Amino acid sequence: MQTIALVDDDRNILTSVSIALEAEGYKVETYTDGASALEGLLARPPHLAIFDIKMPRMDGMELLRRLRQKSDLPVIFLTSKDEEIDELFGLKMGADDFITKPFSQRLLVERVKAILRRAPARDAAAAGVAGAAKSADAPSRSLERGQLVMDQERHTCTWKSEPVTLTVTEFLILHSLAQRPGVVKSRDALMDAAYDEQVYVDDRTIDSHIKRLRKKFKMVDVDFDMIETLYGVGYRFRESA
């Protein structure tokens, strides 16, 4: 059974969303503030987390920032219509998706399913998933482009043999670019590679993910410049690495 962590100080949302997710067969763990959520998420990593932004003790943005220092756990944010700036900041911090309040329970469930379909099988020790140890021994599907190595089965990425931790969305965007070096991928093409059809994202979402990818690789190699921007067209991965 897959576990979803739900973090919100609104108990009505906790109750209604929990019911909707449990009806789909998920186990739900709830938290009412960011501080207790951080402790629980690190001690008992779920398969996916859903955060509100405005919460006591620690808001959702700070929770995500601290979580990203130790985990690439998929995260969906719940936002209000007037929190566009927060949404852009959250994408830069590594959020996988946003849902604007008020929202339908069906929409949220579909977003959860979409991200979990894209996410790799999580380690048994991290998520308590039966059979995960078996998948860890399965043959890997790796993509090698010069100094870049991406393993889809294990959701690992290295540059010059140094590990680079990526979220599910970042991994899929980079994998799409690296599959065909030198070929320009439009933002629409990258959206199709990283998101299910029912999930709407705009150009700024892809741009934010690209910025974060570059930042992560530059932390490993300050000279990293393999992702090129072709203004008005899209992005491409350089042919030589």
UniProtKB/Swiss-Prot annotation:
Pfam families, sorted: Response_reg, Trans_reg_C
Annotation: DNA-binding region: 140-239
InterPro entries: CheY-like_superfamily, OmpR/PhoB-type_DNA-bd, Sig_transdc_resp-reg_C-effctor, Sig_transdc_resp-reg_receiver, WalR-like, WH-like_DNA-bd_sf
PTM comment, free text: Phosphorylated by ChvG.
Cofactor(s) this protein cannot do without: Mg(2+)
4-aspartylphosphate modified-residue sites: D52
Swiss-Prot/TrEMBL GO biological process terms: polysaccharide biosynthetic process; regulation of DNA-templated transcription
Positions annotated to bind Mg(2+): D8, D9, D52
GO molecular function: metal ion binding; phosphorelay response regulator activity; transcription cis-regulatory region binding
Note describing how the cofactor binds: Binds 1 Mg(2+) ion per subunit.
SMART domains for this protein: REC, Trans_reg_C
Protein name: Transcriptional regulatory protein ChvI
The species this protein was found in: Sinorhizobium fredii (strain NBRC 101917 / NGR234)
